[in-house]
From Swiss-Prot:
Presence of keyword Repressor: no
Highest taxon listed in the record's lineage: Bacteria
Name assigned to this protein: Small ribosomal subunit protein uS2
Segments of this protein annotated with the region Disordered: 232-294
InterPro entries in UniProt: Ribosomal_uS2, Ribosomal_uS2_bac/mit/plastid, Ribosomal_uS2_CS, Ribosomal_uS2_flav_dom_sf
NCBIfam families with a match to the protein in the record: rpsB_bact (TIGR01011)
Family named by the database record: Belongs to the universal ribosomal protein uS2 family.
Bias (Low complexity): 260-294
Organism: Arthrobacter sp. (strain FB24)
Lineage: Bacteria, Bacillati, Actinomycetota, Actinomycetes, Micrococcales
Length: 294
């Protein structure tokens, strides 16, 4: 079964790139055509690269790896936090602090400081060893730490993989990952540099629905990897008898429904494949809206 369908990519606007004047020539091989001054990404290639990235993330997690979800732009913040939390992975969705990977020892100290502040009962002024003003300052410090480091509170070492939304905005994360030889899986819009990414996924990194879809796909890969890891640890290949976590149950139920719909999907596949060129013809009005949004 495919990880994601052509119809899902089209409906989410994954094929819309940037304006033709804002592009990276290295992305030329991923571009299908141009409409109303906007590049249209080749979704056939996107499907192939999604499958490749999915298998890599799944295998990495199955062997004990951790995926750090990174996306601080407004369109990605909610999806990054939601999907990473769903599969128990760390995330950064507010601000990338310089040295978060390359100077992880210092970051770990700040995380420890955050956990210490969380032990304070800020409402019990009389029972604490602090004055009201000191408690106010400590609460502000805690709020700032939770905003910047809350998503990586359980990260004890450098992650195995980075999932990044918008490599241009998250260039600090990309640079640090390259220094530590950490593989990067990322959405590549038409203004990005594909040479910076180990597992690129050509697509729209500005539309909320596109970011949501691709981030969910990566989270599903993590979920499958965690299930495989658990089965390897228990020496079983069947689903465990104990109650499954919510994300495991959703994933397995989703797999069953996809298998049940396989015959219908097989009939729709040829039609969906033909929709990619047709979509390019039908995007004139939508491309105009995307132009205004960019």
């Amino acid at each position: 079964m495919p990880v994601v369908t052509m119809r899902q990519l089209l409906d989410s606007g994954v094929h819309f790139g940037h304006q033709t004047r804002r592009w990276n020539p290295k992305m030329k091989r991923f571009i299908f055509t141009e409409r109303n001054g906007i590049y249209i990404i080749d979704l056939q290639q996107s499907l192939s690269y999604i499958d490749r990235a999915y298998e890599f993330v799944k295998a990495t997690v199955a062997h004990g790896g951790t995926v750090l979800f990174v996306g601080t732009k407004k369109q990605a913040q909610e999806s990054i936090a939601e999907q990473a939390t769903r599969v128990g992975q760390p995330y950064v969705n507010q601000r990338w602090l310089g040295g978060m990977l390359t100077n992880f020892q210092t970051v770990s100290k700040r995380i420890q400081r955050m956990k210490e502040l969380e032990e304070i009962d800020f409402d019990d002024v009389a029972g604490s060893a602090y004055t009201k003003k000191e408690l106010l300052l400590l609460r502000r410090e805690l709020t700032k730490l939770e905003t910047n480091l809350g998503g990586i509170r359980n990260l004890t070492k450098a992650p195995s993989v980075l999932w990044i939304v918008d490599t241009k905005k998250e260039h600090l994360a990309v640079d640090e990952a390259k220094k530590l030889n950490i593989p990067v899986v990322a959405i590549l819009d038409t203004n990005c540099d594909p040479d910076e990414v180990d597992f690129p996924i050509p697509g729209n990194d500005d539309a909320i629905r596109s970011v949501n879809l691709l981030t969910r796909v990566v989270a599903d890969a993590v979920a499958e990897g965690l299930i495989a890891r658990n089965q390897r640890a228990t020496g079983t290949t069947e689903a465990p008898e104990e109650p499954l976590a919510e994300w495991e149950r959703e994933l397995l139920e989703g797999s069953k429904s996809e298998e049940a719909a396989a015959p219908a999907a097989a009939e729709e596949a040829p039609a969906a494949a033909e929709e990619a060129p047709a979509a390019a013809e039908a995007t004139e009005s939508a491309a105009g809206e995307a132009d205004a949004a960019k």
